[in-house]
Curated annotation (Swiss-Prot):
GO terms for cellular component: virus tail, fiber. It comes from Enterobacteria phage T4 (Bacteriophage T4). Keywords: Late protein, Viral tail fiber protein, Viral tail protein, Virion. Its main location: virion. It is found in: Virion. The gene is 34. The long-tail fibers are trimeric, with a stoichiometry of gp34/gp37/gp36/gp35 of 3:3:3:1. Belongs to the tevenvirinae long-tail fiber proximal subunit protein family. This is Long-tail fiber proximal subunit. It comes from the Viruses. Structural component of the proximal-half of the long-tail fiber. The long-tail fibers of T4 are about 1600 Angstroms long with a kink in the middle that divides the fiber into proximal and distal halves. InterPro entries: Gp34_dom, Gp34_trimer.
């Protein structure tokens, strides 16, 4: 039986209930009648991945490196490593079909080249019965879809355009664009890919036929308008851009006309417009009205003429224009409301006509923060800060009474309301008008009269509308030949001496003339004195006549004409009662004494007379010298006779300051000065004792206090107080003994606590002490004590010796999963891993283990039940028996089967060689085969009415034996008479638990195939539905021509490495999600890489985005709420590198290597210098220093590209410097770097053509008004043709 083959064949097929089944083994390709199994079918009739172990026929197609290859010749088995020389690559590109005119029925999968240049209209009709995933591509190759119609019609399913609208037809309007139609969800989804959008330069030379999506650049090569004709066909929303390259459009204009009368431009019914602005703009097609709507990017405010009532728009400039002077008219201008704060309006009223009134009116809830009066040359006292601002509802201007202004108003809002404030007010300035009294009353400007005009007298017809300034008025002085002004002479100028050089251009008033009296040195007016005035002798301003002089006789009461007393025989009186003679005769009153007579008049004890002054020695001694008995003491000598310790004399009373000083020994103190010497902090003296009330008041600084009053003050408990809630308690007084105590703090009482000791802090029992951070940190947690504890480091955790540190989850995970020293060994308990593969077992099912036992791991691994059973499968069960086939056990020949007779064998018959039968093999019982069973033709299992099956027993639980028996059953229920008779014939494969799969032909003739579990095929071709109730596992790729539909929220999971990826649709959003590391089949982690809103289609990138190539945003713009970082590529030729399509755009590069940044400009060291005039320091630019920096590029095209280079000096005193340069497209090179100045890096004088502030040299300098040097101002003096020097504080 050992020779029995594992494969068996049948000439006509196996008997399987009347139906043929395929061979078990692979078919022979040379035998035409040989059946095939699934393996052969997949091997020979599908496109598979290249297999180096098999052979291939000529033209057999395989997949290698994601490409299709066909064998050039037969390749024998094994084919070996892939050799491209033995294979021919197959084409996978689309077969493009060119359509130039007429109608065309599109088919799914077609790629159409649309030739619009042929000049014909083309209509494409979409398929009527597409399936999901069908694709059609249309590519314009003619470039004229806007002129020649390209219409795509959907007869059944609608087309979804770029706005999400479902339509039945669309136009291809963009030149060289590609239109992709994908059938999905019962709709044709349309995508338009435009050709690279480039500028189209249009000149006046020819009329340009525009197309949708054109970017037209106007360039005026001649002084003529540019003509542009709009396309014949356009889709709703199509745009054509216009740019004025050389800004000449305002001079030569652009004329835009529609293709025909079916469309309009700017306004319905308008077929031609002329543009005269220079700013960019675009035309957008409105299909609803067949109208090209215009957006003009020109933001310049242009004047709007207003002749009737009008509503003013924000940021608008208007002008009120009157019809004529005979029409009385009131125009109301309504200001807008609820607009943006800061919006302005400008209203010009300088073209109002006579009789015209303009009312500028705010909305009902708004106010105008001014009035007409404040806008018409107000007085200083009529507006703040002298007065309050006013608000009005409207401003009314009349052309006849007001000075019509140009008024600019700005809109603001605050907590008080909404206002229009006057940003600028320019009233019309009139010239003065002397026509009549009414015109003379109006304010106006006036020219200044020249000096010659100002000097004209009234009879010479002077000018009426010129103003005389104080200067010209002051210069119109009176002369002998003209009237004018003259200065009144001052008293000083009039009352000069006779010899003075008097002025001839000033006048003397009667008062000044009357004041010029005659004196000894000047001529003047004077009165004649009366006799009384003469006798009085006190008036020095009147004159005396001879008569008056003669009448003035001298007397005791009047000086006058007198006679001298005689000097001969003069004798003094002998006693005081008597008279002497001559000069001694005191009764004579009409004589005058001459000096000689006076010298005779000496005083004696009995006679009055002249005395001689005593000398100092006589005064001090108290005795006259001999012969000078008439000596007398003068105040001077008397003053020298001062009182000392040794003599009597005069003594001076001390002043109060001298008394207060207390150092003078020669002066006397009076009671008053003694009383006024009051004691102060710096002066000893007398003082009054304060009363108790005065002492308690504490404001008197001039009195003294006694000890009793001080004690009385400080011995009172009223002097102190505390806040009981703060835990303060007081006792005693400030005089006797004052005690201030702080209560101990508790849960209800504020107070003070002492600092706990380390022992007390560790004990944790006291509730009336406080713990400092040091004590808290010193209270360490141990096995016997609670306290603070430090988290152990990873190395401390691995060491495992610390008893006072805590293990974090992170370090616990480390020692449990990664630390080898914590693994379990034969000596210690510890962490283990589960073993797998060669770590558990190395061997086979013949000899068992083939590896030395000592080479297996002894430590850190545990064997799982799976691994245990896998290894035990290679060994006999414990109670199994093995037979020794080499022994006969002493049997004789009679006990053996003979070949020549029929025998019945009672025992078991075992054949070790092939058994050949020429007759049928019939068994009334069962048959068992230890090897394969083969039949050359048919293997029939007869059905005698009982169910038939093929059973594969499980065998012993060892080696590769199955755990359950398997059976193949063929049955049906069509004849069973039950309620279900639909299962006509069933081929079922199962085990002891349930069926694995079955194939059944139903009563209606259809075949169904059911798998109760996971399908792991190489390839499956299913022409109908395939229902899998469990899990289907595919060992290779799965390709579907239709959709993969999953009704689970989580679908399409991909697993590789530590992570799983799947797509989740939670009804509101669709997510791209990842699992946690090591949980590839689990739920999602916290990352949200991609989110799609199911309603809007909006995509949210939650975890960052790296774009390796470019990205294009066609509409909607880009909003970034965080930073954008665009890093360029630094190359060695970065300084001179010309931009390319890959490098145009915004990027930034940090340059830190000297080889690169030395090519770029640096920063300038600033050198401190001193101003030679002011002595103050100032900074001046010094040498250039190269430094690292950042190069940033801006611009979207080569026409708008520029770079900024900003240096970042490495020293703190240096300043950052910014440079910039532009790409010169016409020169194909960068311009030179130029420096950008700012507040931190101002330009030097030489940078702007100015002079430095110190040591400047120039050829000449003209100053119009004045020159100032420090506090000195040098002002020109045109009258004297020189300069004046003025000191300015």
């Amino acid at each position: 039986m050992a020779e029995i083959k594992r494969e068996f064949r049948a000439e006509d097929g196996l008997d399987a209930g009347g139906d043929k089944i395929i061979n078990v083994a692979l078919a022979d390709r040379t035998v035409g009648t040989d059946g095939v199994n699934v393996d052969y079918l997949i091997q020979e009739n599908t496109v598979q991945q290249y297999d180096p172990t098999r052979g291939y026929l000529k033209d057999f197609v395989i997949i290698y490196d994601n490409r299709f290859w066909a064998a050039i010749n037969d390749i024998p088995k094994p084919a070996g490593a892939f050799n491209s020389g033995r294979w021919r690559a197959l084409r996978t590109d689309a077969n493009w079909i060119t359509v130039s005119s007429g109608s065309y029925q599109l088919k799914s999968g077609e790629a159409i080249s649309v030739n619009t240049a042929a000049g014909n209209d083309i209509t494409f009709t979409l398929p009527s019965s597409p399936i999901d995933g069908d694709t059609i591509v249309l590519q314009d190759i003619g470039g004229k879809p806007g002129v020649n119609q390209v219409l795509i019609v959907a007869p059944v399913q609608s087309i979804v355009n770029f706005r999400g609208e479902q339509v039945r037809s669309v136009l291809m309007t963009h030149p060289k664009s590609q239109l992709v139609l994908i059938f999905s969800n019962r709709l044709w989804q349309m995508y338009v890919a435009d050709y690279s959008r480039e500028a189209i330069v249009v000149t006046p030379a020819n009329t340009y036929q525009a197309q949708s999506n054109d970017f037209i650049v106007r360039r005026f090569t001649s002084a003529a308008p540019i003509n542009v004709k709009l396309p014949r066909f356009a889709n709703h929303g199509d745009i054509i851009n216009f740019v004025d390259l050389d800004k000449l459009n305002p001079l030569y204009h652009t004329i835009v006309t529609t293709y025909d009368e079916t469309t309009s431009v700017q306004e319905v019914g308008t077929h031609s417009i002329e543009g005269r602005t220079s700013i960019d703009g675009f035309l957008m097609f409105d299909d609803n009205e067949k109208l090209w709507r215009l957006f003009d990017g020109d933001s310049k405010a242009r004047l709007r003429i207003i002749t009737t009532n009008s509503n003013i728009r924000p940021n608008e400039e208007v002008m009120v224009f009157g019809a004529n002077n005979g029409t009385t008219q009131t125009i109301e201008l309504k200001l807008p409301t609820n607009i943006s704060v800061g919006d302005t309006v400008k209203i010009s009223m300088n073209y109002m006509r006579k009789g015209q009134t303009v009312k500028i009116k705010a909305a009902d809830e708004d106010k105008i923060a001014s009035s007409v009066q404040l806008l018409q040359f107000p007085k200083r006292s009529e507006y703040p800060p002298e007065a309050e601002w006013v608000t009005v509802q409207e401003l009314v201007f009349n052309d006849e009474t007001n000075y019509v202004p140009v008024l600019e108003l700005a809109y603001i809002e605050d907590s008080d309301g909404k206002y229009w404030v006057v940003q600028q007010n320019v009233p019309t300035v009139e010239r003065v008008d002397s026509l009549n009294d009414s015109t003379r009353a109006r304010l106006g400007v006036i020219a200044l009269a020249t000096q010659a005009q100002a000097n004209v007298d009234l009879e010479n017809s002077p000018q009426k509308e010129l103003a005389i300034t104080p200067e010209t008025l002051a210069n119109r002085t009176a002369t002998e030949t003209r009237r004018g002004i003259a200065r009144i002479a001052t008293t000083a100028q009039v009352n000069q001496n006779t010899t003075f050089s008097f002025a001839d251009d000033i006048i003397i008033t009667p008062k000044k003339l009357n004041e010029r009296t005659a004196t000894e040195t000047r001529r003047g007016v004077a009165e004649i004195a009366t006799q009384q005035e003469t006798n009085a002798g006190t008036d020095d301003t009147t004159i005396i006549t001879p008569k008056k002089l003669q009448a003035r006789q001298g007397s005791e009461s009047l000086s006058g004409i007198v006679t001298f007393v005689s000097t001969a025989g003069a004798t003094p009186a002998s006693s005081r009662e008597l008279n002497g003679t001559n000069v001694y005769n005191k009764n004579t009153d009409n004589l005058v004494v001459s000096p000689k007579a006076l010298d005779q008049y000496k005083a004696t004890p009995t006679q009055q007379g002249a005395v001689i002054l005593a000398v100092e020695s006589e005064v001090i001694a108290g005795q006259s010298q001999q012969g000078w008995a008439n000596a007398v003491v003068t105040p001077e000598t008397l003053h020298k006779k001062t009182s000392t310790d040794g003599r009597i004399g005069l003594i001076e009373i001390a002043t109060q300051s001298e008394v207060n000083t207390g150092t003078d020994y020669t002066r006397a103190v009076t009671p008053k000065t003694l009383n006024d010497r009051r004691a102060t902090e710096s002066l000893s003296g007398i003082a009054e004792i304060a009363t108790q009330v005065e002492f308690d008041a504490g404001v008197d600084d001039t009195r003294i206090s006694t000890p009793l009053k001080i004690k009385t003050r400080f011995n009172s408990t009223d002097r102190t107080s505390v806040v009981a809630l703060s835990g303060l308690v007081e006792s005693g007084t400030l005089w006797d003994h004052y005690t201030l105590n702080i209560l101990e703090a508790n849960e209800t009482q504020r107070g003070t606590l002492r600092v706990a000791t380390q022992v007390e802090a560790a004990a944790g029992t006291l509730d009336n002490v406080l713990i400092t951070p040091k004590k808290l940190l010193g209270t360490k947690s141990t096995e016997a004590q609670e306290g603070v504890i430090k988290v152990a480091t990873q190395s401390e955790t691995v060491t495992g010796t610390s008893a006072n540190t805590a293990v974090s989850p992170k370090n616990l995970k480390w020692i449990a999963q990664s630390e080898p020293t914590w693994a379990a060994t034969t000596a210690i308990r510890g962490f283990v891993k589960t073993s797998s593969g060669s770590i558990t077992f190395v061997g086979n099912d013949t000899v068992g283990s083939t590896q030395d036992l000592e080479l297996y791991e002894k430590n850190s691994y545990a064997v799982s039940p799976y691994e245990l059973n896998r290894v035990l499968a290679n060994y006999l069960p414990l109670k199994a028996k093995a037979a020794d086939t080499n022994l006969l056990d002493g049997l004789d020949s009679s006990q053996f089967i003979r070949r020549d007779i029929a025998q019945t064998v009672n025992g078991s018959l075992t054949l070790t060689q092939q058994t050949n039968l020429s007759a049928p093999l019939v068994s009334s019982s069962t048959g068992e085969f230890g090897g394969s069973l083969a039949a050359n033709r048919t293997f029939t299992i007869r059905n005698t009415g009982a169910p038939t099956s093929i059973v594969f027993e499980k065998g012993p639980a060892s080696g590769a034996n199955p755990a359950q028996s398997m059976s193949i059953r063929v049955w049906g229920n069509q004849f069973g008479g039950g309620s279900d008779t639909t299962r006509s014939t069933v081929f079922e494969v199962g085990d002891d638990t349930s069926h694995h799969f079955y194939s059944q032909r139903n009563k209606d003739g259809n075949i169904a195939f059911n798998i109760n579990g996971t399908v792991m095929p190489i390839n499956i071709n299913a022409s109908g539905l395939m229902n899998v109730n469990g899990t289907a596992t595919f060992g290779r790729s799965v390709t579907a021509n239709g959709e993969f539909i999953s009704k689970s929220a989580n679908a399409f999971r991909a697993i590789n490495g530590d992570y799983g990826f799947f797509i989740r649709n939670d009804a509101s959003n669709t997510y791209f999600l990842l699992t946690a590391a090591g949980d590839q089949t689990g739920g999602f982690n916290g990352l949200r890489p991609l989110l799609i809103n199911n309603q809007s289609g909006q995509i949210t990138i939650g975890e960052g985005l790296i774009i390796a190539k470019g990205v294009t945003i066609n509409s909607g713009g880009l909003t970034v709420n965080s930073r954008i970082r665009s890093q360029g590529t630094k190359t060695s030729d970065l300084y001179t590198r010309a931009p390319t399509s890959d490098t145009v755009g915004f990027w930034s590069i940090d340059i830190n290597d000297s080889a690169t940044y030395n090519q770029f400009p640096g920063y300038f060291k600033m050198v401190e210098k001193t101003n030679e005039v002011t002595g103050l320091p100032y900074l001046e630019r010094g040498e250039e220093v190269k430094s690292p920096g950042t190069l940033t590029q801006f611009g979207n095209t080569l026409d708008s590209l520029y770079q900024d280079w900003i240096t970042y000096p490495t020293t703190p005193e240096a300043r950052t410097t910014r440079w910039t340069r532009t790409w010169q497209k016409t020169k194909n090179s960068w311009s030179s770097f130029v420096q950008v100045f700012d507040g931190g890096n101002p330009p030097q004088p030489s940078d702007i053509g100015a002079l430095p502030s110190d040591n400047a040299t120039m050829g000449n300098l003209t100053i119009r008004d004045f020159l100032r040097i420090g506090n000195v101002r040098i002002v020109p003096d045109p009258v004297n043709k020189t300069v004046k020097f003025e000191w300015v504080e």
